[in-house]
Curated annotation (Swiss-Prot):
GO terms for molecular function: oxidoreductase activity, acting on NAD(P)H, quinone or similar compound as acceptor; quinone binding. The gene is ndhM. One of its GO terms (cellular component) is plasma membrane-derived thylakoid membrane. Its main location: membrane. It comes from the Bacteria. This is NAD(P)H-quinone oxidoreductase subunit M. Transmembrane segments: none annotated. NDH-1 shuttles electrons from an unknown electron donor, via FMN and iron-sulfur (Fe-S) centers, to quinones in the respiratory and/or the photosynthetic chain. The immediate electron acceptor for the enzyme in this species is believed to be plastoquinone. Couples the redox reaction to proton translocation, and thus conserves the redox energy in a proton gradient. Cyanobacterial NDH-1 also plays a role in inorganic carbon-concentration. It is found in: Cellular thylakoid membrane. It catalyses: a plastoquinone + NADH + (n+1) H(+)(in) = a plastoquinol + NAD(+) + n H(+)(out); a plastoquinone + NADPH + (n+1) H(+)(in) = a plastoquinol + NADP(+) + n H(+)(out). It is a peripheral membrane protein. Belongs to the complex I NdhM subunit family. NDH-1 can be composed of about 15 different subunits; different subcomplexes with different compositions have been identified which probably have different functions.
Length: 115
């Protein structure tokens, strides 16, 4: 019987109940895989990426033992979106000017001229 792949998709976060094998997603109810900013809207430093990964691990741990549902995955995804917004507002994360579509989905950049 095929396993069902649960997923959460937000603007900048995708979470799957799967593992990656040979660049393919293989359903796995015992593992969550995070795809961060698939459209490359932001410029990510290693430290900011680690901060998001750490927050993801904390959120997953806080839901350990609970039902693995679409709703809970969406809660984790929404929390990560909020973390991304905070990092952007704090100046730790910036928009990628080379992005395919520069739409400032999390608000206009905070620059001294705009404050």
């Amino acid at each position: 019987m095929n396993e069902t792949l649960l997923k959460c998709t937000t603007r900048h976060v995708r979470i799957f109940t799967a593992r990656v094998e040979n660049n393919d997603l293989v359903p796995d109810p015992n593992q969550l895989t995070l795809d961060l900013d698939p459209d490359n809207e932001f410029l990510w430093t290693e430290s900011v990426t680690k901060e998001i990964q750490q927050r993801f691990a904390e959120l997953v741990a806080s839901h350990a033992g609970g039902e693995l549902s679409d709703y809970n995955l969406r809660r984790i995804g929404s929390e990560l979106e909020g973390t991304i917004r905070k990092l952007l507002q704090a100046g730790k994360l910036s928009y990628n000017p080379e992005c395919r579509v520069l739409n400032y989905s999390m608000g206009l950049p905070r620059t001294p001229e705009l404050l």
